[in-house]
Every structure is written in structure tokens, then in C-alpha cells.
């Protein structure tokens, strides 16, 4: 059976995620200490199967949304790869870049799913932005409860959290703008030619 390239990219992203999670959870390397890898080991694989499970439960309407699945899994892979390479502790701007880029990727995935519906561009923009804002808040709450409240980072957590929320929201808005433009283009139909 011939599989599209997107299938193999999707499998590669998920395989890399699981492999790096195992390294983070079981290697004993210093860069994973205090980073809530037990929680990541449980929640990240669940996040990686949201699209396939939802697609299956929704009746498997073809084609499979590979783009959405890849976009929704990539932020988790980027996070774990950044920890594996010790980038959060060795590059001062890495965490900030991740909040922008990962929320752009996450929201692009949600946008790809919305493009499969009849929702108009303005609603797409609002839903993608809202999803990004809510998930950024939930992420920061999870960070606080899993490792910040009992760490040396607590003293600077408020300022860092505000910056992370702003960057996550900005990434969400960028993804929402692109997705709304794609929805508008799809509504307009093919260009005369």
C-alpha cells in the first residue's frame, strides 16, 4: 500500500517524540531534572494521538488530516528536543522562542482542522486565537503546579509568565491570520484563469 509522504513525516515526528520522551524520563541526564518529565511522559503521547482518535471517532472522513496532526504534535517534539539538547538552560532566548513558535504550530494545527469545516474566516480567526490564548494560560498553570512553585524560578516566575503568555498569544494570532487568509481564499474559490 502506497502511503503519502505526509504519513511518513507524521510517523517520524511521533517516533522522535516518543524516543526523546524515553530519554528524558529514564536517562538521568541533568538537563531533565526538575522539568516534570513524568508529566511529559504521560501527557505528550496523549496529545500526539488526539487527532487520530478524534478522526476515528468522527467517522474517518477522508483524507486523514496529516497537516493538522503534524502541526499539533510538533510543539511537543520541539519542547522535548530542546530539553534533550539542553537548549533551555544554554540559550537565553530559547524558552521565549518556543512559546512563540510552538503556539504558532499548535494553532496552525487547530486551524488546519477548522479549514475542513464550513466556518468563515472571521470565526476561524477567533477560534484559533481563542484556542491559543486558553492553551497558553493552561500551559502556564501546569508549569507552575508541576515545577515552578517549588523551584528557584519562583522569584522571577511572574515576569516570565507574562512574557510567555504574550509570546504564545502572538504565535496564536500569527497562525490565526494565516488560517483565516486560507479560509478566505477557499471561500473565494479558484482564481479565474
For each feature predicted by the language model, list its residue ranges.
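Interfacial helix-loop-helix junctions of multi-pass membrane proteins
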Residues: 86-95, 137-173
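Alpha-helical transmembrane segments of multi-pass membrane proteins
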Residues: 52-55, 75-82, 108, 131-143, ...
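Membrane-interfacial alpha-helical segments at the cytosolic side of multi-pass membrane proteins
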Residues: 101-118, 125, 148-152, 169-183
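Cytoplasmic-side transmembrane-helix entry/capping segments in multi-pass membrane proteins
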Residues: 39-41, 62-75, 95-101, 123-127
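Membrane-interface helix-boundary motifs at transmembrane edges
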Residues: 3, 32-36, 54-67, 117-123
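N-terminal membrane topogenic signal
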Residues: 1-16
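Loop-to-helix transition at the N-terminal end of transmembrane alpha-helices
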Residues: 33-52
Amino acid at each position: 500500500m502506497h502511503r503519502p509522504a505526509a504519513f511518513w513525516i507524521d510517523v517520524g515526528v511521533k517516533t522522535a517524540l516518543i524516543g526523546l520522551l524515553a530519554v528524558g524520563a529514564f536517562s538521568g541526564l541533568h538537563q531533565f531534572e526538575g522539568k516534570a518529565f513524568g508529566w511529559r511522559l504521560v501527557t505528550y503521547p496523549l496529545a500526539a494521538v488526539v487527532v487520530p482518535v478524534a478522526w476515528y471517532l468522527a467517522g474517518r472522513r477522508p483524507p486523514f488530516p496529516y497537516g493538522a496532526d503534524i502541526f499539533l504534535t510538533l510543539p511537543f517534539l520541539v519542547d522535548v528536543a530542546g530539553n534533550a539538547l539542553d537548549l533551555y538552560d544554554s540559550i537565553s532566548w530559547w524558552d521565549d522562542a518556543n512559546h512563540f513558535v510552538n503556539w504558532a504550530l499548535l494553532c496552525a494545527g487547530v486551524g488546519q482542522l477548522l479549514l475542513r469545516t464550513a466556518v468563515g474566516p472571521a470565526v476561524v480567526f477567533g477560534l484559533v486565537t481563542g484556542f491559543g490564548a486558553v492553551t497558553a494560560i493552561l500551559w502556564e498553570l501546569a508549569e507552575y503546579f508541576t515545577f515552578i512553585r517549588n523551584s528557584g524560578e519562583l522569584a522571577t516566575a511572574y515576569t516570565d509568565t507574562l512574557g510567555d503568555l504574550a509570546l504564545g498569544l502572538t504565535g496564536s494570532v500569527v497562525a490565526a491570520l494565516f488560517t483565516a487568509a486560507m479560509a478566505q481564499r477557499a471561500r473565494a474559490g479558484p482564481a479565474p484563469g
